[in-house]
């Protein structure tokens, strides 16, 4: 049914005509998410009529039908203006039972009406900055969190819970003030951690089900997304013991999340949200990933249960198969694994054994191949600076931040970016809490070590001598041509001669020489003025 015909039916004021038209329109457009521009004015007219009835009060027996029509029209970004008035948003909040006003909805609201209203609010908040502002000013987050807090005591339909959480996610994703309000004033981390525990159905023994059902998976992912939003910028610093205990408890739940599968094909997506949130936890709280007691079926290394680390490594390998949005795909899990390896020697040694096993193939470039090491080394020269930074940092930590070891496994050419950023081009080792791990060389590596090109990280075939057969005069002529070309490139600033500063940073050759001379003068007692 066309929107013009529906608008004309609404204008008749006859209930049976209106209901027939709305039901027909709703059924026809239940799955419509794109709309014909030619009918845009008709849809706006219909939206204004619906808003007029919405603000005056929907007929109690047909609220769901009216709200379904509002929901369909709220998908059209060109028809949002009528719905984004303060009165309209307040009316929808009342029907969703999340308004602060009194007496708008009965004590036991119709859950179908609540659900449709929540869907309308989600559409409006997603697409309209005005709706986002009005929702924040109306403090809808307060009533939403109150209802979320009742999930343990009262039974709510899955869809109502899901859209409660979806609306929370949208508000916290789009409004900084709502994020801060939920984190600080409403104690959102505690509330949502408790809700996550309830959703995962963790038993008193601390064991969730082996397979998370579909509905629980959907709700858990929304909870994880809201928690990610409110912790993103809030807990980067030191936390007190009470907060640390809360984040460790959240960490144990996230540990469960990365260890279980979900019904359907959403396991990797579910694990991704859990890993993203792990990256927001205080670093000292990540120790919960290694506190599982070893058991018969667990992966044990140096007396520590490595099941979670192995699960994260498997997740990383899956994400490395993706070719788009690598930053969002691999950076979070690499960051978590890096911090675990940095702080816990057993985790570092286990990961090194899996990612950087003793070198045997010394004739292939480190970035060539399908082993995990090869894929990570390839990322070290990725166009996205964040991707190459986290990949290099992970491998560097697995090498106990030893420059020679790092170059051995990645090649100097691949390692140069991180070494330059760290001021380690001249070698050395940064300060770190690392024991002197042994790095066992294979017989193949020992035999070929002297022939390995440190830049490429492999044994290179000896190239033919390009000057073979030339006279000394010809060699001198070619050398002068090369000097002239370099001089021209340098004068035109196409290239710039570089040198190593005393602090290990790449800098212009002139600056490097000046710094070196200054350092020599400052350390020479005879250079003091008379």
Curated annotation (Swiss-Prot):
The modification Phosphothreonine is found at residues 440, 442. One of its GO terms (biological process) is G protein-coupled receptor signaling pathway. It is found in: Cytoplasm, Cell cortex; Cytoplasm. The keyword Chaperone applies. It comes from the Eukaryota. The keyword Chaperone applies. GO terms for cellular component: cell cortex; cytoplasm; plasma membrane. Keywords: Chaperone, Cytoplasm, Guanine-nucleotide releasing factor, Phosphoprotein. Its main location: cytoplasm. The modification Phosphoserine is found at residues 435, 501, 522-523, 527. Phosphorylated at Ser-435 and Thr-440 by CK2, stabilizing its interface with G alpha proteins. GO terms for molecular function: G-protein alpha-subunit binding; guanyl-nucleotide exchange factor activity; protein folding chaperone. Interacts with GDP-bound G alpha proteins GNAI1, GNAO1 and GNAQ, and with GNA13 with lower affinity. Does not interact with G-alpha proteins when they are in complex with subunits beta and gamma. Interacts (via C-terminus) with RGS14; the interaction stimulates the dissociation of the complex between RGS14 and the active GTP-bound form of GNAI1. Interacts with NCS1; interaction is favored in the absence of Ca(2+) and myristoylation of NCS1 is not required. Chaperone that specifically binds and folds nascent G alpha proteins prior to G protein heterotrimer formation, promoting their stability and activity: folds GNAI1, GNAO1, GNA13 and GNAQ. Does not fold G(s) G-alpha proteins GNAS nor GNAL. Also acts as a guanine nucleotide exchange factor (GEF) for G alpha proteins by stimulating exchange of bound GDP for free GTP. Belongs to the synembryn family. This is Chaperone Ric-8A. It comes from Macaca fascicularis (Crab-eating macaque). The gene is RIC8A.
């Amino acid at each position: 049914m066309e929107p013009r015909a529906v608008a004309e039916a609404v204008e008749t004021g006859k209930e049976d005509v209106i209901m027939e038209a709305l039901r027909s329109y709703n059924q026809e457009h239940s799955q419509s998410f794109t709309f014909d521009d030619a009918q845009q004015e008709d849809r706006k007219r219909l939206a204004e009529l619906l808003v007029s009835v919405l603000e005056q009060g929907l007929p109690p027996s047909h609220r769901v039908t009216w709200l379904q029509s509002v929901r369909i029209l709220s998908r059209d970004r060109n028809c949002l203006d009528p719905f984004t008035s303060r009165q309209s948003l307040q009316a929808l909040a009342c029907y969703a039972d999340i308004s602060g006003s009194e007496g708008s909805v009965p004590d036991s609201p119709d859950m179908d009406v609540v659900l449709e209203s929540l869907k309308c609010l989600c559409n409006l908040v997603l697409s309209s900055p005005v709706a986002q502002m009005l929702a924040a000013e109306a403090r809808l987050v307060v009533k939403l969190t109150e209802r979320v807090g009742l999930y343990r005591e009262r039974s709510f339909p899955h869809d109502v819970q899901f859209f409660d959480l979806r609306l929370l996610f949208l508000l916290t994703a789009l409004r900084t003030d709502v994020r801060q309000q939920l984190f600080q004033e409403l104690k959102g981390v505690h509330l949502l951690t408790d809700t996550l525990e309830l959703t995962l159905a963790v038993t008193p023994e601390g064991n969730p089900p082996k397979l998370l059902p579909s509905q629980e998976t959907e709700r858990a992912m929304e909870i994880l997304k809201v928690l990610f939003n409110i912790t993103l910028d809030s807990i980067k610093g030191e936390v007190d013991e009470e907060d640390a205990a809360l984040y460790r408890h959240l960490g144990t739940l996230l540990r469960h999340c990365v260890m279980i599968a979900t019904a359907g094909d959403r396991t990797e997506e579910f694990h991704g949200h859990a890993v993203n949130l792990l990256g927001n936890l205080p670093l000292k709280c990540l120790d919960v990933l290694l506190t599982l007691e070893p058991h018969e079926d667990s992966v044990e290394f140096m007396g520590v249960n490595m099941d979670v680390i192995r699960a994260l490594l498997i997740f990383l390998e899956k994400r490395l198969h993706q070719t788009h949005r690598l930053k969002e795909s691999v950076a979070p899990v690499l960051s978590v694994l890096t911090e675990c390896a940095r702080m816990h020697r057993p985790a570092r040694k286990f990961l090194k054994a899996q990612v950087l096993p003793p070198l045997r193939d010394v004739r292939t470039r480190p970035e060539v191949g399908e082993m995990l090491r090869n894929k990570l080394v390839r990322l070290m020269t990725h166009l996205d600076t964040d991707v190459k930074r986290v990949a290099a940092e992970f491998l560097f930590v697995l090498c106990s931040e030893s420059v020679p070891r790092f170059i051995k496994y990645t090649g100097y050419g691949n390692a140069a970016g991180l070494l330059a950023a760290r001021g380690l081009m001249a070698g050395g080792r940064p300060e770190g809490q690392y024991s002197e791990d042994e790095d066992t060389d294979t017989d193949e590596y020992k035999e070929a070590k002297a022939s390995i090109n440190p830049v490429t990280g492999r044994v290179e075939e000896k190239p033919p001598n390009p000057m073979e057969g030339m006279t000394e005069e010809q060699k001198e002529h070619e050398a002068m041509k090369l000097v002239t070309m370099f001089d021209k490139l340098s004068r035109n600033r196409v290239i710039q001669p570089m040198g190593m500063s005393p602090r290990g940073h790449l800098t212009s050759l002139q600056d490097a020489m000046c710094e070196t001379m200054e350092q020599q003068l400052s350390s020479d007692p005879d250079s003091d003025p008379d």
